[in-house]
């Protein structure tokens, strides 16, 4: 049986078992972020889909207007001049076959992998290593591209790739506890709109099941989905 710390029990006691208006939920998450570091704020979205069917899968990207507050490590697999181009653009790792070899051995010192189209036959062989970690480059998410400078710039600025897991749940970080509430709300709203725009064609019945937000060390707080969808952004 999992033992709940006094700190978590105290924080959880302040959370009611109901869906909160978006801004109120965000303020509660910020108030619950009492760790001695800048906690990450995450959204956990349960959707009415069954990802084992190809027409009920969702994998896309979102560019958060206020970023995530995190620095991501980007690796690039390319050839020749493109390797130097990637490094100049800010890639943390860049290489050809030698990088493919190191990844095949389990060396995963990065959060995102970008590849040029001509290198995909070699990258495809890494599927067993990259696939389970959600790191396989994909044209749909902009991680298979010849425009390395543009892709690196976008992902470093806060563009995120996300997908629904086997249970139909999306997990996305959308800021830090140090962000002001309005910035977090704007990011969360952008995420909601992105998910709605990418609703799978095979989704049936109620699409949004639940939405919870939480900080790294804090309790989960349910958000009123309809209220979030009703917010208009200019």
UniProtKB/Swiss-Prot annotation:
Intrachain disulfide bonds: none
Stored InterPro entries: Ribosom_uL1_bac-type, Ribosomal_uL1, Ribosomal_uL1-like, Ribosomal_uL1/biogenesis, Ribosomal_uL1_3-a/b-sand, Ribosomal_uL1_CS
A single cellular component GO annotation: large ribosomal subunit
Q: Which GO terms describe its biological process?
A: regulation of translation; translation
MF terms from GO for this chain are:
rRNA binding; structural constituent of ribosome; tRNA binding
UniProt keywords, alphabetically:
Repressor, Ribonucleoprotein, Ribosomal protein, RNA-binding, rRNA-binding, Translation regulation, tRNA-binding
Q: Which domain of life is it from?
A: Bacteria
What this chain does, per the entry, is described as: Binds directly to 23S rRNA. The L1 stalk is quite mobile in the ribosome, and is involved in E site tRNA release.
Q: Tell me which family the UniProt entry assigns to this protein.
A: Belongs to the universal ribosomal protein uL1 family.
Name of the protein this chain belongs to: Large ribosomal subunit protein uL1
The species this protein was found in: Prochlorococcus marinus (strain MIT 9211)
Q: Please name the taxonomic classification of the source.
A: Bacteria, Bacillati, Cyanobacteriota, Cyanophyceae, Synechococcales
Gene label: rplA
């Amino acid at each position: 049986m999992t033992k709940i710390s006094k700190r978590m029990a105290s924080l959880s006691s302040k959370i009611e078992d109901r869906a909160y208006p978006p801004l109120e939920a965000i303020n509660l998450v910020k108030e619950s972020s009492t760790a001695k570091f800048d906690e990450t704020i995450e959204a956990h979205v349960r959707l009415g889909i069954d990802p084992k069917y190809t027409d009920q899968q969702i994998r896309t990207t979102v560019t958060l207007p206020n970023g995530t507050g995190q620095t991501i490590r980007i690796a690039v697999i390319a050839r020749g001049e493109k390797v130097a181009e990637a490094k100049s653009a800010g890639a943390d790792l860049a290489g050809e076959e030698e990088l493919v070899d190191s990844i095949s051995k389990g060396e995963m010192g990065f959060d995102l992998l970008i590849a040029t189209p001509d290198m995909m036959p070699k990258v495809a062989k890494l599927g067993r290593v990259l696939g389970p970690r959600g790191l396989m480059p994909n044209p749909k998410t902009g991680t298979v591209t010849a425009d390395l400078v543009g892709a690196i710039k976008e992902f470093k600025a806060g563009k995120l790739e996300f997908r629904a897991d086997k249970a139909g749940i999306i997990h996305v970080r959308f800021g830090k506890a140090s962000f002001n509430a309005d910035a977090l709300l704007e990011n969360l709203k952008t995420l909601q709109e992105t998910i709605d725009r990418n609703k799978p064609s095979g989704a049936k019945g109620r699409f949004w099941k639940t939405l919870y937000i939480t900080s790294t060390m804090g309790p989960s707080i349910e958000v009123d989905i309809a209220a979030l969808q009703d917010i208009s952004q200019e």
